[in-house]
Amino acid sequence: MQQLSQSLAENLSALDARFGNSADYYAKKIVLYGCPGCIVLFDGMASLDSLWELLLEAAGRQSASVRLTGAQAYAHILHGSAFPAESTPVQDMSQLVARLTAGMAVLLLEGCSSGIVFSVQGLKFRSVEEPSAEGNLRGSREGFTDLLRVNLSLLRRLVRTDTLMQEAAQAHTCCNTEYALCYCKDRADPAMVQRVRAILQSARPELLLDSSYFVPWLLPGKARLFTPVHYTERPAVAAAKLCEGKLVILVNGSPSALVLPALFSEQFECLDDYASTAVFSSFLRVLKYFSFYLTVFLPGVFVCVAVYLPELLPPQLLYKIEAAEKATPLPLFAEMLLVILLLEIIREAGLRMPQSLGHSVSLVSALIIGDAAIATGLMSTPVIFVASITAIAVFVTPGLYEPATLLRIGTVLLAGLAGPVGLAAAFFGFLLSLVSTEALGVPYLAPHPFPQQPLSEDGVLRRNYRQLSRQGFNIWQKRERGKRRS
């Protein structure tokens, strides 16, 4: 670790060796209290206007009749003046680089081996606006932005207690990306907080561009269909999860907050659930559960029944399916797989392409799948109808899009190759994957395994919010209660 020298020229030479060829590196030599010095910063990250206003103008008024050495000027600025300097100076080159790349300005003085830091960040970032991926009718419209400090302030404004802890650190990556671990110390399990803190400190991702990059370290082990973490771009949702004792991880440069541990039932909840009546919220949750199982199993059930158990279908429906399939060259399950894959290709194209071309994709996909495929006899109308229903139903629970898509394809394959046996195998594999998933010792199906009557409280159905508020919910207390009774 290279310590700062008392020689200003040596310190500037070391900085020039690191950043001398960078276009945004800025170094301005000044004389402060009769002592030579230099202000170093990165243009565009630190605000020059704020720097001149807060530091140089005040120094110019005072330094005309004062002559100090470097050490004396350092002590006076840090402890005996009104200059807005940080309380912690920098004493080595790594600390200096970290402050500069965070958008701060550093004052180096001749004869002083420490630098004075000024918080004059002028970073440009996306404004706080409503996230497009999480819509709601009522409640807060704020969303996380890309700057970590702004996101932490949004959380602090909602959770206005002295129990909210926000621990910031730098990840061991090539970019030294900053992240923050947030929790409420009176609600979170201290052992789990220490465990997650140690995991984050020991993680070695090559890059850290989003909070999801930490998941392989937080949840090591074999591949799994369901990932027991939750992502949100809404500070209100993150604040609610903190009050439940959960942990929130934020990464600089990403508006997505990682919440863990996450529960399967939370994928069917939203902010509007608690702003509506209990009856209507329960109806919507039942509808979401139905939509999820519909998008996973409907194509497989359709293939299984139409190919292996046609006697279960009404005669008129069976005749129409049979007539449509005779006009197509592919087996029914291969046709269903082809339609599902085409829909996924269209979705991916619409997601990645420029927004100005989105209408063109919709028009072309409607002509190809909706009209041309049927007219040429490559696909049948019943198959397209079933695949379209499942494609729409999956967006009711966007947090389960990835496992639902993989399960749908696997169910169609097993149902087409093995019939009812394959369909049953797919269903039991789905249940086994759910039951075997956990995070930080909390089962993914919690709180349903816990003895707390989930159907009548805040599970598939929801009780009145006034009644829920009397009991409260803390995920670690529920876990311990379940262990004691089991």
Regions found by a protein language model. Give the residues of each.
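Generic detector of multi-pass transmembrane helix bundles and their immediately adjacent loops
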Residues: V301, P314-S486
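C-terminal TM-helix exit segments that contain a strictly Trp-centered aromatic cap at the helix terminus
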Residues: V215, V301-A306
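Membrane-embedded alpha-helical signal segments
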Residues: M1-F297, E311, P315, V435-S486
